Amino acid sequence: VKIESDPAHVEAATTPLHWKQGFAEDFADFPVAYRRVKATVLQEPRRLCWSDGAAACIGLNSKHLERHAHDFESCFAQGQVEYLGQTLAPVASAYAGHQFGVWAGQLGDGRAMLLGDLPSQASAGDWGFDAIDSIHLSDRIEVQLKGSGQTPYSRMGDGRAVLRSSIREFLGSEAMIGLGIPSTRALCLYGSDDPVFRETTETAAIVTRLAPTFLRFGHVEFFAHFHHHDALNHFLQKLAKRHYPKALSARHDASGLNDDDLYKLALFKSIASRTGDLIARWQSVGFCHGVMNTDNMSLIGLTIDYGPFGFLDQYDEDHVCNHSDHQGRYS
């Protein structure tokens, strides 16, 4: 399966991969924010899906894919990145959150890991944003593997993803872009015959996700709840600088707040507005996320973490797409 986009956009993309590990570099002084991890590789992986539109965001096209198929398999099916003679270790980030209205404590990337980030060739529209959104994008794109094995944040899970749900995420996220709904992107999907035990025995898969950032509400909650105040201030400064620079221009006014509090208030308002706009767009196409816990909500207004999502065929305000949501909290 190949998801295609504008051929002119795709053919223009010929840049090789130039990796950085931006998250680890940003939080080098705050090791509590992440852990170095190693992927659980897929045995005899098969590339099942590839999105030309997502690939163009990082300067790749289908010809590039065929020419460097082995290298891409090492990256996206095995989590092994070689760059400038060095092996880059993926990272899993720590966050916390409220799940179904209840404080869940420390969470984190339990079955996902950040390979690193790459130079961006994406426009706002490539993420589903309109020109009127005035979204500010950084010049890097984060690359994340989902289903890549256990991390220190996996709790009791195996860190794997099954093929069935991975196909849903791949198709769902790329479809949302086509509908004009801000979303993470799915670059590619690898499957294998490795068994994964759920209600029944299924097979393992890894989907590669792209985003301007995977930062979520839960990152803020983690730093705040566990009193990592210096890390929190550092985190908010980085977030504002890269994605909400207008918030940093907030200055002293008659409210009595100092400049530091003013920029944080401006940042909060911007995030709330972006989130409200996203949910309105979901409603406009009948999209139901299903698990709107704070660890699944993006700080820049992207649809992230496609789990038991669905679409309404006809309007039903009581529809619950997540069978685990027994009280219908996210109907």
Pin down the residues of each PLM region.
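Short acidic (Asp/Glu) and glycine-rich catalytic loops that position anionic groups and cofactors
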Residues: P31-V32, W50-A54, H319-G328
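Charged, compositionally biased N-terminal leader segments and the immediate start
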Residues: V1-A28
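A short, surface-exposed helix-loop junction/capping segment
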Residues: A28-V37
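Conserved ATP-binding subdomain of kinase catalytic cores across diverse folds
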Residues: E44-R47, G53-L65, D71-S255, D259, ...
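Catalytic activation segment of kinase domains across protein kinase-like and atypical kinase folds
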Residues: T201-A204, S284-H289, N293-S331
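Low-complexity, Ser/Thr/Pro/Gly-rich disordered linker/stalk regions
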Residues: A39-V41
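Phosphate/ATP-binding catalytic cores across multiple sugar-kinase/actin-like superfamilies
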Residues: I271-W282
